[in-house]
From Swiss-Prot:
This is Tubulin gamma chain. Tubulin is the major constituent of microtubules. The gamma chain is found at microtubule organizing centers (MTOC) such as the spindle pole or the centrosome, suggesting that it is involved in the minus-end nucleation of microtubule assembly. Interacts physically with beta-tubulin and is involved in microtubule function. The keyword Nucleotide-binding applies. The lineage of its organism: Eukaryota, Fungi, Dikarya, Ascomycota, Pezizomycotina. PANTHER family: TUBULIN. The gene is mipA. It comes from Emericella nidulans (strain FGSC A4 / ATCC 38163 / CBS 112.46 / NRRL 194 / M139) (Aspergillus nidulans). It is found in: Cytoplasm, Cytoskeleton, Microtubule organizing center, Spindle pole body. The keyword GTP-binding applies.
Length: 454
């Protein structure tokens, strides 16, 4: 029985990435731009109903809710080539249409105003599912809507659907290039909700995405469309085991359980290979892709979609490689042995040091230039370095009291700036949790007692 997943897209980034994701899913399942099954799509064996439902006229409609506080991106989707696949009742544009002005407080306060309408949509989709497993939430944490309205919705969804899983795909800002000066404020406040209200967070950051696109396509300035295409490739690859189910990892809880042994350390990194012309136009085709080649490349830092600074003690908590295409299980076994012999991945001292592998088929409707492709979902302790950078940048702004006036105008800060202090404490605790996970006594109940007050 399929376990359905409802996708919620919030803000400019969430909707741009989401629209690419739905295009990709339509291509993979042989669904036309108006939601009808293409005549050649007769293979079967795929579960379309995890992400789509069928309307009375048998068209496939995404289980998607598209939210934004300003109209530009959603208007673009409503007039774009795939405009007819969405349920028009599932678009929500804020009444004023002025957006959240890159202010987390404005986005969060807007949540209070719009929650009734938005949760009507979410409830309607949930009631239309036979066996809802959870939600996929797409947003960026730097602006106002994705971070602020996103935070509000994550809190409320947790209260409203306590037994359903929430998996987010969260785009982090490039911490080196501050296109929005208040990024660190918005990111820190959103990070608190990602820590407390999500079951699993796939961390993608603009710096790494741009670097990978620039590297593969030999372009100086990658466009957002190219980086969004990359994110949608990761999303579609990370859901292949749900859509082409095997006997393992065929639902969201199976994937999350295999990657997240302790509830707070639920931030995942991704790598994907090979980037060829199928994923991004103009990418150079690599010659021969073997399972070993793919698995080795997945472990290379340059293929990671997150800018992190691993230290000597950084290690993997868990790894799941999703291998698509013509992969022989004996090749997989040999590749794992080779990786272990060469010590290409170092694991935590308190858990199993194994790479899990899920083999899935590729869509029969898309012509591929490579035999095998792979996505790595990994839980790695060095993700904490990204969170530390956000806190350091936040501290620099806060020390100068920079731009605080515009936050004080918003409802969440009417009674003071405690919201900031609480968020900082939550993120620092999370950093501490990942650092503790690098030690052997991590699971010892008395561990860390001597270190309090360091």
């Amino acid at each position: 029985m399929p376990r359905e997943i409802i996708t919620i897209q919030a803000g400019q980034c969430g909707n741009n990435v989401g629209s690419q994701f739905w295009q990709q899913l339509c291509l993979e399942h042989g669904i036309s731009q108006d939601g009808n099954l293409e005549e050649f799509a007769t293979e079967g064996g795929d579960r379309k109903d995890v992400f789509f439902y069928q309307s009375d006229d048998t068209r496939y409609i995404p289980r998607a809710i598209l939210l934004d506080l300003e109209p530009r991106v959603l208007n673009g989707i409503q007039s774009g080539p795939y405009k007819n696949i969405y349920n028009p009742e599932n678009f929500f544009i804020g009444q004023q249409g002025i957006g959240a002005g890159n202010n987390w407080g404005a986005g969060y306060a807007a949540g209070e105003v719009v929650q009734e309408e938005v949760f009507d949509m979410i409830d309607r989709e949930a009631d239309g599912s036979d066996s809802l497993e959870g939600f996929m939430f797409l947003h960026s944490i730097a602006g106002g809507t994705g971070s602020g309205l996103g935070s509000f919705l994550l809190e409320r969804m947790n209260d409203r659907f306590p037994k359903k899983l929430i998996q987010t795909y969260s785009v982090f800002p490039d911490t080196q290039a501050a296109d929005v000066v208040v990024n660190p404020y918005n990111s820190l406040l959103a990070m608190r909700r990602l820590t407390q209200n999500a079951d699993s967070v796939v961390v993608l950051d603009n710096a790494a995405l741009s670097r990978i696109v620039a590297d593969r396509l030999h372009v100086q300035e990658p466009s957002f469309q190219q980086t969004n295409r990359l994110v949608s490739t990761v999303m579609s690859a990370s859901t292949t085991t749900l859509r082409y189910p095997g006997y393992m990892h065929n639902d969201l809880v199976g994937i999350i359980a295999s990657l997240i042994p302790t509830p707070r350390s639920h931030f995942l990194l991704t790598s994907y290979t090979p980037f060829t012309g199928d994923n991004i136009d103009q990418a150079k085709t690599v010659r021969k892709t073997t399972v070993l080649d793919v698995m080795r490349r997945l472990l290379q830092p340059k293929n990671r979609m997150v800018s992190i600074n691993p230290s000597k003690s950084s290690c993997y908590i868990s790894i799941l490689n999703i291998i698509q295409g013509e992969a022989d299980p004996t090749d997989v076994h040999k590749s794992l042995l080779r990786i272990r012999e060469r010590r290409l991945a170092s694991f935590i001292p308190w858990g199993p040091a194994s790479i899990q592998v899920a083999l899935t088929k590729k869509s029969p409707y898309i012509q591929n230039t490579h035999r095998v492709s792979g996505l790595m979902l990994a839980n790695h302790t060095s993700v904490a370095t990204l969170f530390k950078r956000i806190v350091q940048q936040y501290d620099r702004l806060r020390k100068r009291n920079a731009f605080l006036e515009q936050y004080k105008k918003e409802a969440p800060f009417q009674d003071g700036l405690d919201e900031f202090d609480e968020a900082r404490a939550v993120v620092m605790d999370l950093v501490g949790e990942y650092e503790a996970a690098e030690r052997e006594n991590y699971l010892d109940p008395d561990a860390g007692k001597d270190e309090v007050g360091v």
